[in-house]
Amino acid sequence: NKLRALLVHTFDTVPFYRDKYKSLGIEREFLANIRLTELKLLPYTTKDELRKYGASTMLSSSLSKGWFEYSSGSTGTPVHIYVPEYVAQVFSALMENRVRNWAGVSCVMPRGMVGGRRILPKSKMQKPFYRYNIFEKQTYFSAYHISEQTVENYLRGIVENKVEWMTGYAMSNYFIADFIQKAGLKAPQLRAVITSSEKLTLEMRQIISDVFRCKVFDSYSGCEACGLISESSLGELLVSPDVGIMEFINENGDYV
């Protein structure tokens, strides 16, 4: 019923989807009574369409309170996405239950984050290369200044702020761990490292695990909040069906 209500909402209030439905002869009544077996009849939305219309005709005329965020850009150019406040709250709870809980950590533990937010200009090579958010006990590390010359400052941020677990871009967390190892430095033992946004290879996982002496957990989906795939304590990548219905299609839009 929630899915039907959402589809009707897009027909009534979102110009982009209403036009797409009508071009295929899909009417409001069909959406109000759609069955799971009929989902394949709905048009899919491409990343290019999301980039082009995400801040215009894809927005609802009855927009609830929220804000714009950028996706990680792991598949190319970052996408500008509007996030309603209530969606952020619900997805935060899901992340706590299905990602952090499975990794044995929580949002109240001091954490380190390596993401796309620019906390200082890329050209500015002045310490520190992190900022501390006292309210969330979060140390936000710059993803744009990681190098052999700066890694000692990253390690200092982890130690001084008593970081218990790390999260963020897989490649950035790997580079931090790799440079720490190559510099012969010793990192504190963490509870877990949770990666996202980029492919985590076996080599990357091993080096991160060796340096921080903890398990590494992979996860996918965040900013878009349209699904959630996370790694369990058994090392399985699992889709959370209560977050959203996930369909797998190839580059031609055919089901696989």
Show the residue positions of the predicted features.
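Nucleotide 5′-phosphate-binding alpha/beta core
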Residues: N1-Y70, G76-P110, R117, E160-T167, ...
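Intrinsically disordered, low-complexity boundary segments flanking structured domains
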Residues: L24-E29, T37, R98-N101, M125-Y132, ...
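Short, charge-rich amphipathic segments
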Residues: I81-A93, R111, R131-S147
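Conserved AMP-binding loop of ANL adenylate-forming enzymes
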Residues: E96, R100-Y132, F141-Y144
